[in-house]
């Protein structure tokens, strides 16, 4: 079974959403139509990144990582190519 991890970014909000699905096209259409269950509503979005896995467990582990602090840093550095702002 193919499982897809995806990262989308709200165009107006600038917020990222990380999710997994077994049908990427259907899931993105659910986000577009506002029918995505369990996810935040981000409006119009841009698909930033996808990864394909052969099993749910591995995809879920990757999703959990990308939702962590280190994972968000990886997204910023690798996908968005930015550095987090440093407060002082």
What are these regions (language model features)?
Residues 1-38, 43, 50-53, 57-67, ...:
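GIY-YIG nuclease catalytic motif and its immediate N-terminal context
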């Amino acid at each position: 079974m193919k499982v897809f991890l995806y990262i989308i970014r709200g165009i107006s909000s600038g917020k990222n959403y990380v999710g997994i699905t077994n049908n990427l096209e259907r899931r993105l259409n659910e986000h577009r139509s506002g029918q995505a269950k369990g996810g935040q509503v981000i409006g119009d979005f841009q698909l930033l990144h996808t990864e394909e896995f052969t099993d749910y467990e591995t995809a879920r582990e990757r999703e959990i990582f990308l939702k962590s602090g280190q994972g968000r840093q990886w997204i910023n550095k690798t996908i968005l190519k930015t550095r987090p702002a440093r407060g002082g």
